[in-house]
């Protein structure tokens, strides 16, 4: 099964997450199929904290990829920001 989830990067105390499409059996930070965007929880004002390639996200969902709960929450957050802007 293919899943859209977060893959952690960054250093200790400074997390940075890539939003990736990966096989469910592969470890969290392991091999992935495609990188769809990123999430920076420590982004300051004026910095981009979240970017998602909506066209690729739609494609992967259409071919049956499951979205993790956290990524689903981030997608909704990005949609709210897009409407507000």
Swiss-Prot record:
Xref: Gene3D superfamilies: 3.30.1320.10
Pfam families: Ribosomal_S16
Biological process, per Gene Ontology: translation
InterPro entries: Ribosomal_bS16, Ribosomal_bS16_dom_sf
Keyword annotations from UniProtKB, A to Z: Ribonucleoprotein, Ribosomal protein
GO molecular function, one term: structural constituent of ribosome
Entries under SUPFAM superfamilies matching the protein: Ribosomal protein S16 (SSF54565)
One term under GO cellular component: cytoplasm
Source taxon at top rank: Bacteria
PANTHER family reported for this sequence: 30S RIBOSOMAL PROTEIN S16, SMALL RIBOSOMAL SUBUNIT PROTEIN BS16M
Similarity comment: family membership: Belongs to the bacterial ribosomal protein bS16 family.
Protein name per the record: Small ribosomal subunit protein bS16
Organism: Paracidovorax citrulli (strain AAC00-1)
Gene name for this UniProt entry: rpsP
């Amino acid at each position: 099964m293919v899943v859209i989830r977060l893959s952690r990067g960054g250093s200790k105390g400074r997390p940075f997450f890539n939003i990736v499409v990966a096989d469910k059996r592969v470890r969290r930070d392991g091999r992935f199929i495609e990188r769809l965007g990123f999430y920076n929880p420590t982004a300051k004002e004026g910095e981009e904290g979240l970017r998602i390639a909506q066209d690729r996200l739609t494609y992967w969902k259409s071919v049956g990829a499951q979205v993790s709960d956290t990524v689903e929450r981030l997608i909704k957050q990005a949609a709210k920001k897009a409407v507000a802007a």
